[in-house]
Amino acid sequence: MTDRTTPAKKQADRFARAREKQSRALLEDYAELIGDLIAELGEARVADIAERMGVAQPTATKAISRLKREGLATARPYRGVFLTDDGADLADRVRA
């Protein structure tokens, strides 16, 4: 059997893998930062997360939504963002 994958398909696959790795690394950064803010300030507010990450609040909100979808964080209205046990474990692994 011959490999019929075109060069364009191979390149697209390579780019997709790179984007996924970058996306995962960014998620790890957010989890670590949320843990740091909670340890430092007792809470992690979206405004503080956005400021520390150097992004706009909607960008931080989108990343937090992904953390929540993946079961790594929870958010409470007017109370901030909190890491789940899995999120805290991820933040600890990133720090190590």
Describe these PLM feature segments.
Residues 58:
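Key DNA-contact positions within bacterial/archaeal DNA-binding proteins
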Residues 79-95:
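Basic, amphipathic "hinge/linker" alpha-helix immediately C-terminal to the N-terminal HTH DNA-binding motif
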Residues 64-65:
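Short, hydrophobic-biased segments on the C-terminal half of alpha helices
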Residues 1-17:
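Long, low-complexity, charged/polar intrinsically disordered regions in eukaryotic proteins
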Residues 13-55:
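N-terminal helix-turn-helix DNA-binding core of bacterial DNA-binding proteins
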Residues 68-78:
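A short, conserved structural fragment
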